Amino acid sequence: MDGVKANQRQQLQLLLVAARHQLSRSDLRSMIQFLENEDCGFDVTLQMADPSEQPELLELHRLVATPALIKLSPTPKQVFAGSSIFQQLQNWITRWQQDIVVTGLGLSLRPTELDGSRTQRELQLEDQLLVLRQENETLIDRLNAQERTLRMVAHELRTPLTAAVLALQSQQLGQINIEHFQDVVKRRLDEIELLSKDLLEVKSTRWEDLFNPQNLDLGNIAAEAILELEKLWLDRNIEIHTDIPSDLPKVFADQRRMRQVLLNLLENALKFTEDGGQVSLSMLHRTSQWVQVSICDNGPGIPEDEQERIFLDRVRLPQTSVTTSGFGVGLSVCRRIVEVHGGKIWVVSEPDKGACFYLTVPVWQRNGQE
């Protein structure tokens, strides 16, 4: 009997296309553990590939969004993508097992009927319909991912443009000399050029895969961000207090993206602080794994029921006064950037008592991140 069962087992060849940081997703970890340890009725072969190392796979399998799981064998090929890859796989494994019954043990059954009520042709049509539905869901996920990527990169362009405009205004008012002005504008134009290259990569690369984490001094990045926004706080007599320990460890992060997060949070804090108010920026070595950053203001605060929504895509809270425009897409971009780095971002606030935004950034580990 064991020999019969062994002959009935069919090879299931799967390919998981995912970047290294995506493999930390809980659903992907659960799926990999399931395929390695559970008996799903197949002899499973799971291959994994990083799209940054094998970009040809994106074109070969027509992938726009990753992670993606591809069933290579038995045919026909199927692609699973989106946020429910493991669930999709579990649903289809049952149907693949039914196919084995039809093509294997089913040889002794009546070919016209499988369950006594539906013909084999009806079941085949149902299978084809399910495949079409799954492909449609995958296509929608791809389009949504591409739209989200375009929105993220387009918003990133705003940061260097804002810095260049502020530098121009400061130079016209005589607040900075021409050499400083030229240096700021050149650096921001270089950044815009890099972002334009990112836009060209959107068709074949996820926004998250454009990140380039490195050994980074986060204190220096914060100091540069404060200087770039100096016109916003000097003109309004706002005090900025910093608390950055001299022994703060280096972090492992993308310099451009982390600078963008700090600029966005500082700009929001300045925008919601009244003239003559205060904004604080603090950093501390929370654990051996993380540096925690906090940016606080003494503005109008954020209602508790809105503190989760402000980090969602396409959510903009109503303006709090005639001079402020409300929190917008910048916070959703900040959340995505922080989460790609493996950290988290949150806000603590009470109405009329200001707001403190917190985020965590991974500490650079000499042995594992060189």
Swiss-Prot record:
SMART domains: HATPase_c, KaiB. The modification Phosphohistidine is found at residue 155. The gene is sasA. GO terms for molecular function: ATP binding; phosphorelay sensor kinase activity. This is Adaptive-response sensory kinase SasA. Keywords: ATP-binding, Biological rhythms, Kinase, Nucleotide-binding, Phosphoprotein, Transferase, Two-component regulatory system. Residues 152-365 form the Histidine kinase domain. PROSITE patterns: HIS_KIN.
